[in-house]
Curated annotation (Swiss-Prot):
Pfam families in UniProt: UPRTase
Organism: Schizosaccharomyces pombe (strain 972 / ATCC 24843)
Residues where uracil binds: 188, 193-195
Source taxonomy: Eukaryota, Fungi, Dikarya, Ascomycota, Taphrinomycotina
Family: Belongs to the UPRTase family.
Function field: Catalyzes the conversion of uracil and 5-phospho-alpha-D-ribose 1-diphosphate (PRPP) to UMP and diphosphate.
InterPro entries the record matches: PRibTrfase_dom, PRTase-like, UPRTase/APRTase
Top-tier EC class: transferase
UniProt protein name: Putative uracil phosphoribosyltransferase urg2
GO CC entries: cytosol; nucleus
Entry GO MF terms: GTP binding; uracil phosphoribosyltransferase activity
Amino acid sequence: MSTTTTVSAIRTVEEMSNITISSHPVVNEQIAILRDRSLKPSQVRSVVDEISRFLAYESTKTLKSPSVSIVPVLRSGMSMMSAFSKVLPDVPIYHIGIFREKSTLQPIEYYNKLPKKSTDTAVILDPVMATGGTANAVITTLQEWGCKNIIFVSVLASEQALTRFSNIPGVEFVIGAVDKSLDAKGYLVPGVGDIGDRLYGATA
């Protein structure tokens, strides 16, 4: 019964015009591996890189503007950089640092290295989109910067967050897979845990 509900929910998200969810079997397989909490940090980084390689091709296949930047969200967005810099080797890379305050779940920006002049298109990298708070903060920052087209790429996202951003003009989402639920701490269920800690072997 729960499987049917989850599939139905994902189909609803897939119908949103600005959201693309990968159907590639390798992406699905690698996300299933990523859910294994016993993986070592080096294995987590390898799996995220492999998924990112497929998402990089998917998210850039319709790029038209020569004015493009890559914006990884520190710290976990850096894990997707290698794959995207191979597909877009000569575009500038700008960094935005945001962390989610644990008690309020609100995003707090602590680093912003955007230049004065914006690019027409920005590809944002953040492997997990849970509540959507961080995504909203980064999108708002880039829009205020003057960026007209935003492509937000995540390995895993919640249905709640994607529904929040449905049909926003100038913003597209390319997602590896969707989880339906969030727990009380704002983590995806079943999710992949704290992806930043898992990537770098840190503890909360």
